[in-house]
């Protein structure tokens, strides 16, 4: 697009990337087994497999204690670095993004409309239930746009929100859209996955 620069493109950290970020610090968790169980319940096993690791092997390191878990997380970190571009994109991921004039806010899964943007913390990844509560302009943004919804219900547009989740990765479609600064959809594609 005319006038675009590379910095205009922002990659958002999704729930899986947030779980991976926390997995790399598992040795610091007070109850690493409980934390890892939660991560497994939230599908981190696919990421482990992608880097040549397994749930069973990870559990063995956790059982061996903090030092063994630290060695394992360092090994996983090194495996990520060995894959060209993987570490670079993980470093570049942003919690949220907004247009220069503050018209549009882009998030992974949700927000808590009762909190300012700087206090959202985990709501960006786990705030699905609050997203549907947005029935007025949030913090001056014309639209809040998210790309993940637990039910993968497709494209949903309300006066103040947009959801783009056709279930990509779950047998559905990959949804993408281009918005003007008023939050109106000017182009949209849907690709079977």
Regions found by a protein language model. Name each.
Residues 1-193:
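Feature recognizes metal-dependent phosphohydrolase scaffolds
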